[in-house]
């Protein structure tokens, strides 16, 4: 058990070091079994955080994203948080003025994360395979940059199915309606 943990820590350290040394614009910590975003990464990456535009934390065991994470990586354009245990986002997500795409599929959201509705550059929101029943339709309709909202495999209410062009200027992806069983 300790050996596997040590290997996981070493893998994360290697990925962070590669990003810092090569001054790349992305950090890929997908599939690292992270339960939280390691605090040590903030210090290790402080010289390059402004240049990080893409972060993948997909397929970990994250239960939350902190406001510190959002404010540290303020220049993000793409954020992949798919396959975690997230059920809400910090309000500070609204400060990500350059964020164009966020993948929150396969998480634990029961409601649409409303702070996303005020992220100005957001074009793509993927919330496939969550537990979302409520969607702030009016707020979504006013999102000028939004091009695609994926709500497939969510138990959304019938009002969401009424969101069609030209009422909303984006593509809304939903699972087909299940036929109602006949009595």
Where in this protein do the model-derived segments appear?
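Extended, charged alpha-helical interaction scaffolds
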Residues: 103-110, 116-118, 122-130
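The feature captures the LRR N-terminal capping module
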Residues: 1-82, 88-91, 101, 114, ...
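Solenoidal tandem-repeat scaffolds enriched in leucines and small polar residues
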Residues: 123, 127-133, 147, 153
């Amino acid at each position: 058990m300790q050996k596997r943990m040590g290997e996981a820590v070493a893998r994360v350290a290697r990925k962070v070091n590669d990003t810092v040394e090569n001054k790349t614009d992305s950090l890929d910590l997908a599939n690292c079994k992270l339960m939280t975003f390691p605090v040590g990464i903030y210090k290790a990456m402080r010289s390059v955080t402004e240049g990080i535009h893409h972060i993948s934390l997909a397929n970990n065991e994250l239960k939350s994203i902190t406001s510190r994470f959002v404010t540290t990586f303020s220049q993000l354009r793409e954020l992949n948080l798919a396959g975690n245990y997230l059920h809400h986002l910090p309000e500070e997500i609204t400060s990500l003025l350059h964020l164009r795409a966020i993948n929150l599929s396969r998480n634990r959201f029961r409601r649409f994360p409303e702070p996303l509705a005020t992220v100005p550059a957001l074009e793509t929101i993927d919330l496939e395979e969550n537990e979302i029943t409520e969607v702030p339709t009016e707020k979504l309709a006013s999102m000028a940059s939004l091009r695609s909202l994926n709500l497939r495999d969510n138990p959304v209410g019938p009002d969401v199915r009424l969101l069609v062009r030209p009422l909303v200027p984006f593509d809304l992806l939903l699972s087909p309606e299940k036929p109602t069983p006949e009595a």
